[in-house]
């Protein structure tokens, strides 16, 4: 600290020591650090208070609207928008099961067979349905007469037999006689649908057919061509191809050759 001290004389001649306090950049005193910390704390508190006020402003502070007692819809008037609340869906009512009480085991078997017949009636033919109705009536009478004395094994066998009969039947929408009549009608319609050729059609077909020249004309055409070719060959090689003999006048001399076979 000696360099910051200097001595000077006062008016009375006393020597006083004075200290020069210089401002050093980057150095803080305790009072300045405390003031900066207090300012930072104040800013943080102000920011948290502002965020709290903003969050409270976004919440629906006022709700305007009424809810109907009968479960109807209502409107909620919020500060920013209006919200529509739909009524809750009513729970589906439970379907009451229909239970048919049978008087005895025979009636129960007949009802079971009738239910099976109704399930398979959509795919069975009319003839099969009539036969099944007759057999069902007979079986129901027998079941009513001796339902108490029929063992369980025979009942299961009869039920399996009925199921087998229903499976073995082939669905058909026409009787055999109707099918044969329909096929004959279709065949007759196809035969009748073929139109007979008329005179104009026959003449048109005749005109479109290629015309073939007669045999005499064809023979005359090829004979003229063969004659011209024979004349050209005789003039060039002094040989008559029609008769098969050489000609005297010419530059070629023809010599007969005896074949080995002869």
UniProtKB/Swiss-Prot annotation:
Keywords: Cell cycle, Cell division, Mitosis, Protein kinase inhibitor. Induction: Down-regulated by cytokinin. Residues 198-208 have a biased composition (Low complexity). Expressed in roots, stems, leaves and apex. GO terms for molecular function: cyclin-dependent protein serine/threonine kinase inhibitor activity. One of its GO terms (biological process) is regulation of cell cycle. InterPro entries: CDI_dom (IPR003175), CDI_dom_sf (IPR044898), KRP (IPR044275). Pfam families: CDI (PF02234). Residues 160-169 have a biased composition (Basic and acidic residues). Signal peptide: none annotated. GO terms for cellular component: nucleus. Gene3D superfamilies: p27. Residues 140-212 are annotated as: Disordered. Plants overexpressing KRP1 show a reduction in the filling rate of about 2/3, and no embryo is observed in the empty seeds or seeds containing underdeveloped endosperm. Regulates the production of endosperm cells, affecting seed filling and embryo development. Regulates endoreduplication of endosperm cells. May play a role in the exit from the mitotic cell cycle during rice grain formation. Inhibitis leaf elongation rates by decreasing cell number, that is partly compensated by increased cell size. May not affect growth rate or cell size of the primary root. Belongs to the CDI family. ICK/KRP subfamily. This is Cyclin-dependent kinase inhibitor 1. The lineage of its organism: Eukaryota, Viridiplantae, Streptophyta, Embryophyta, Tracheophyta.
